[in-house]
UniProtKB/Swiss-Prot annotation:
UniProt cross-references to Gene3D superfamilies, sorted A to Z: 3.30.2300.20, 3.30.70.2810, Vaccinia Virus protein VP39
Protein keywords: Cytoplasm, Methyltransferase, rRNA processing, S-adenosyl-L-methionine, Transferase
Gene assigned in the entry: rlmM
Family note: Belongs to the class I-like SAM-binding methyltransferase superfamily. RNA methyltransferase RlmE family. RlmM subfamily.
The protein's name in its UniProt record: Ribosomal RNA large subunit methyltransferase M
Function of the protein: Catalyzes the 2'-O-methylation at nucleotide C2498 in 23S rRNA.
Organism: Photorhabdus laumondii subsp. laumondii (strain DSM 15139 / CIP 105565 / TT01) (Photorhabdus luminescens subsp. laumondii)
Matches recorded under PANTHER family: RIBOSOMAL RNA LARGE SUBUNIT METHYLTRANSFERASE M, RIBOSOMAL RNA METHYLTRANSFERASE FTSJ DOMAIN-CONTAINING PROTEIN
Main location class: cytoplasm
Coiled-coil regions, chain positions: none
EC number of this enzyme: 2.1.1.186
Amino acid sequence: MNKIALYCRPGFEKECAAEITDKAGQKEIYGFARVKDNSGYVLFECYQYEDADRLIREIPFRELIFARQMLVVGELLRDLPPEDRISPIVGMLHGVIERAGELRVEVPDTNESKELLKFCRKFTVPLRNAMRQEKILLIRENVNRPVIHVFFIAPGCCYVGYSYSNNNSPFYMGIPRLKFPSDAPSRSTLKLEEAFHVFIPHDEWEERLASGLYAVDLGACPGGWTYQLVKRSMMVHAVDNGTMSKSLMDTGQVKHHKVDGFKFEPSAKNIYWLVCDMVEKPAKVTQLMVDWLVNGWCREAIFNLKLPMKKRYEEVAHNLQKMHLQLKEGGINAQIQAKHLYHDREEITVHVRRIWSAYAASRNDY
């Protein structure tokens, strides 16, 4: 197996391909990307057989922006016989992997592939049983073992491969399943909720998304992102010249500042979270976030960068590198992650966590 399959949002295959080619080159691993527009996935074929496995071990999945999932696959299995689709799939995995912890039978995130989902769900049970009999799959699911992926791109045609559970997306098809809350003021609320799931480990939610924390939402109206903060019992400064949702204002947890988000400055040093979803040039938003972090006005930030029509990966990489250098020059040690989330469209979501000095600070310092 010398190929890597990367799932992505349809229409962003070129960005996904540019990114994996760049990351592989940094590891001195070379190959070429196969791209089909609006397919929802990219294949990167390595020149050296063993390099595919090395790539999915050594490239941190959390550092990939446009990939929803990353796995090693073999050659495309075509025209699987309807009377026995299982044997060719199991045969692909003999000698490649054993005692895997989970099986996922998946499809690309396209309208055409959605018709295959019903088949995938039915097919998973007999395929799982066959893999367990062959000792390719453990009897019980184990989150610490590799994941087997069977990726159907058309009826009777699939890629078979695996990912490592410590360096992949834990979500089926790489997509968190979130339900839109009926009382939220806009669907944009799902972007921030997904960002929390993707960027913050669940065992740290009680500390980093705790009730009583103070937050600022720049470009808040009507309150989709503020809703997520209020739901977690935070106190929120909502900054926008527009109108906020009455139900959010009625909670008593929101203070509305009718000010331009680029001009607002907090009056106190107790802000933990800064969130921002404003329609503005990426460079301008990036600079605003740098200013907040260097000034010590927040501890963590989640914000969106709107994407240009062309050279989207290059523009994103440039802005993130610029942010990294400016924070470093400002004496700030920070963790930066970016992802093209499922609920993002022509934008990416960035998370920055400022790392404070080595001594333990009290909660009141935030």
